[in-house]
Amino acid sequence: NGWNDNKTFILIGSASWAALVLLVGSLNSFVI
């Protein structure tokens, strides 16, 4: 069970990190 929670946490973390990178990238392209 602990491993499942860990996997879900990693999945959510990497997904939100990718979304953050995309957001910053699009903001940079708008500013430039």
UniProtKB/Swiss-Prot annotation:
Protein name as it appears in the record: Photosystem II reaction center protein Z
Keyword Transmembrane helix: yes
InterPro entries reported in the protein's UniProt record: PSII_PsbZ, PSII_PsbZ_sf
Lineage top rank: taxon: Eukaryota
Xref: SUPFAM superfamilies: PsbZ-like
Positions of transmembrane segments: 9-31
Stated family: Belongs to the PsbZ family.
Function: May control the interaction of photosystem II (PSII) cores with the light-harvesting antenna, regulates electron flow through the 2 photosystem reaction centers. PSII is a light-driven water plastoquinone oxidoreductase, using light energy to abstract electrons from H(2)O, generating a proton gradient subsequently used for ATP formation.
Mode of membrane association: Multi-pass membrane protein
Keyword Membrane: yes
Pfam families: Ycf9
Cellular component aspect of the GO annotation: chloroplast thylakoid membrane; photosystem II reaction center
Assembly, per entry: PSII is composed of 1 copy each of membrane proteins PsbA, PsbB, PsbC, PsbD, PsbE, PsbF, PsbH, PsbI, PsbJ, PsbK, PsbL, PsbM, PsbT, PsbY, PsbZ, Psb30/Ycf12, at least 3 peripheral proteins of the oxygen-evolving complex and a large number of cofactors. It forms dimeric complexes.
Compartment(s) of residence: Plastid, Chloroplast thylakoid membrane
Keywords, comma-separated and alphabetical: Chloroplast, Membrane, Photosynthesis, Photosystem II, Plastid, Reaction center, Thylakoid, Transmembrane, Transmembrane helix
GO BP: photosynthesis; photosystem II stabilization
